[in-house]
Amino acid sequence: MKKMIAILLSVLTVLCMCACSKDEPRTETKTDDYTPDYGELYYASGDTKFGIMDPAEEVLNALGEPVNGTFESDSCAYQGKDYFYYYDGFEVMVNDVDGVKRITGITVADDTVQTPQGLKIGMKLEDAQALLTGEYKQVGDVYKYTQGSTVLKLAVGDDGTLTAIEYAVAANDK
C-alpha cells in the first residue's frame, strides 16, 4: 500500500510540474523578417533561387522531391542533425538554426550543372575568377570568396580546373 501511495504521489508531482510549465504558443516565426545577405553568391535551379541561411521549407518545396534521395546524420557544426537532399547535379544541406530549418550548404555535385555565376566543375580557375567579383582568400588549393553570410569555395586540381564548388556558412569557415 505504501508503494502505491508513493507511486501516485510521484505521478501527481510530475503532472503538477508539467501543468505549471510555460508553453507559450508560437504566434510568429523567425522567418518573417528574414532578408538574404548572400549578395551574388546564391544558387538557382530552374526558377528557384536560394542561398545560405534561407529558410529551407519553401526552397525544398519549390525544388520538389529530391531525385537522388535524402540522408541525415548527426551534426558536428549544429545541434541535432544534418539533412542532405540530393538533386540532379547538386546537393542541399539543411540544419536547425535557432529553431528554423535553414540551408547551410549547397554543393555542385558534377559537371552537368552551372551556377548562376557561370561556374562549372571542370572549367579553368582563371575563367572562374574572371566571372567573380571581389577578393578571395587562397588556402592550399581552395579559393574562397565571401559575401555576407556565404563563403563560396572553389577547389582546384593539379591541372588548374575546378574540382569542387561549394556554398557554405561564412561564420563556420574558420
Model-derived regions, located:
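N-terminal, intrinsically disordered, polar/charged segments of Gram-positive cell-envelope systems
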Residues: 6, 22-63
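C-terminal motif of bacterial Sec signal peptides marking the signal peptidase cleavage site
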Residues: 15-19
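Short acidic DE-rich linear segments
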Residues: 24, 172-174
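A low-complexity, Ser/Thr/Gly/Pro-enriched, surface-exposed linker/loop concept
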Residues: 104, 108-115, 121
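A cross-family detector of function-defining hotspots
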Residues: 35, 45, 56-98, 120, ...
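Short, surface-exposed ligand-recognition loops at beta-strand->loop->(often short) alpha-helix junctions
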Residues: 48-52, 116-121
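Positively charged n-region of N-terminal signal peptides that target proteins for export
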Residues: 1-4
